[in-house]
Amino acid sequence: MNFETIIGLEVHVELNTNSKIFSPSSAHFGEDPNASTNVIDWSFPGVLPVMNKGVIDAGIKAALALNMSIHQHMHFDRKNYFYPDNPKAYQISQFDEPIGYNGWIDITLEDGSTKKIRIERAHLEEDAGKNTHGTDGYSYVDLNRQGVPLIEIVSEADMRSPEEAYAYLTALKEIIQYTGISDVKMEEGSMRVDANISLRPYGQEAFGTKTELKNLNSFSNVRKGLEFEVERQAKILRSGGVIRQETRRYDEASKGTILMRVKEGAADYRYFPEPDLPLFEIDDAWIEDMRAELPRFPAERRASYIKDLGLSAYDAGQLTATKALSDFFEQAVALGGDAKQVSNWLQGEVAQFLNAEGKTIDQLALTPDSLVEMIAIIADGTISSKIAKKVFVHLAKHGGSARAYVEKAGLVQISDPAVLIPIIHQVFADNEAAVADFKSGKRNADKAFTGFLMKATKGQANPQVAQQLLAQELQKLLD
């Protein structure tokens, strides 16, 4: 029997506000344990939450970016549960009136086609603290993360394979990153994914019993965990077994999933409206103000790069991987840079430099105008492509004008025959054995002279001019 895979994803995104959702404590990552806390985060008796308007701004932007309707009469709810990293014994979240609902995004499949994935809801809430279990037998609670603003984005169960889930996460991350509301760094916990997966026989309408997957710390692990679950559940069903409603975690060492707990039923969090916060009215003007701050999103940019600039779908996809990279590219083209040349540099030398240095493009001293200028002086013969790589490294580290640096560093390409011919003659004089080989008929010996000449000019000889002049002067040796 063959089974259809049903996948839905819950994605928690930390919002990059300066302060927490209901307290003035810093929301920045990486502080010493409990350094970013105050009486609200510790839930001292009598303290009251104060709404951070920036969180609602971010929620509106997310809802708009994900094609969602917005609840314009919005409130918060208490989600009641006890855990050591939750000192209030409840979480302030949203239940029946999330900020966004009924949305969708398009994903690109492996064959190049697109598929619409529906999004059920996006709700705002506060993050919980973090428990650390020490080797000394004690458990420690760090409340720096307590109260950091989150938006939880819950998809419909529209994905039919681990590959579709991977494509959805990739598209979702791009969109959220473009809005500027989060840096979506999974390694820092600012994007976290839980997956729900079930199987059903093809043709059956009812969903099967779902398994929830946690500990998915990368998109790759999401895909691997789901692939393992497809095989695990299919094997159980084919043998006549029954799938239990479980929470499992992905284990990188075994490349499989491990049981965490069996769910007896749906959790009862006893939601009720948060009495310490008012109803929030989101009027049309507020929504339009947030819409005006949104950029062009990746899909629109990719289509423009392909249609208007003649780039390939692959190049367009690479250039829109981050908003900073896409903005840099568009600025360079607006300054007169050839789109294909700019694209080649960004995907080649620039990408290699960024990977080696562990930086992002907005951390470079290189500017779009200096890259365009460098491409121009390659085209007009001022420098060779080889020298350009050296120039690029300087610009990436120090910035400035490409032409000014080339002139100051003496890197201008030598194209004048009056300068090159005497150097060629000196090369002949310094390499008599190679000249003798050439004269004796070893025609491949002429290739060695190119290397001798480039060495003598420290790589500054114009390759095309140098080849022509070498051929001319070598012929004279035979005449």
From Swiss-Prot:
Report whether Chloroplast shows up as a keyword of the record. no
Q: Report the InterPro entries cross-referenced here.
A: Asn/Gln-tRNA_amidoTrfase_suB/E, Asn/Gln-tRNA_Trfase_suB/E_cat, Asn/Gln_amidotransferase, Asn/Gln_tRNA_amidoTrase-B-like, GatB, GatB_C_1, GatB_Yqey_C_2, Gln-tRNA_amidoTrfase_suB_CS
Keywords, alphabetical:
ATP-binding, Ligase, Nucleotide-binding, Protein biosynthesis
**UniProt-listed SUPFAM superfamilies:** GatB/YqeY motif (SSF89095), Glutamine synthetase/guanido kinase (SSF55931)
Per the record, what are the reactions this protein catalyses?
Answer: L-glutamyl-tRNA(Gln) + L-glutamine + ATP + H2O = L-glutaminyl-tRNA(Gln) + L-glutamate + ADP + phosphate + H(+); L-aspartyl-tRNA(Asn) + L-glutamine + ATP + H2O = L-asparaginyl-tRNA(Asn) + L-glutamate + ADP + phosphate + 2 H(+)
Which Pfam family, an example, fits this chain? Answer: GatB_N
Q: Name one GO biological process term.
A: glutaminyl-tRNAGln biosynthesis via transamidation
| UniProt record similarity statement | Belongs to the GatB/GatE family. GatB subfamily.
Its biological purpose:
Allows the formation of correctly charged Asn-tRNA(Asn) or Gln-tRNA(Gln) through the transamidation of misacylated Asp-tRNA(Asn) or Glu-tRNA(Gln) in organisms which lack either or both of asparaginyl-tRNA or glutaminyl-tRNA synthetases. The reaction takes place in the presence of glutamine and ATP through an activated phospho-Asp-tRNA(Asn) or phospho-Glu-tRNA(Gln).
Q: Which PANTHER family match?
A: GLUTAMYL-TRNA GLN AMIDOTRANSFERASE SUBUNIT B MITOCHONDRIAL AND PROKARYOTIC PET112-RELATED (PTHR11659), GLUTAMYL-TRNA(GLN) AMIDOTRANSFERASE SUBUNIT B, MITOCHONDRIAL (PTHR11659:SF0)
Name-wise, this protein is Aspartyl/glutamyl-tRNA(Asn/Gln) amidotransferase subunit B
The encoding gene is: gatB
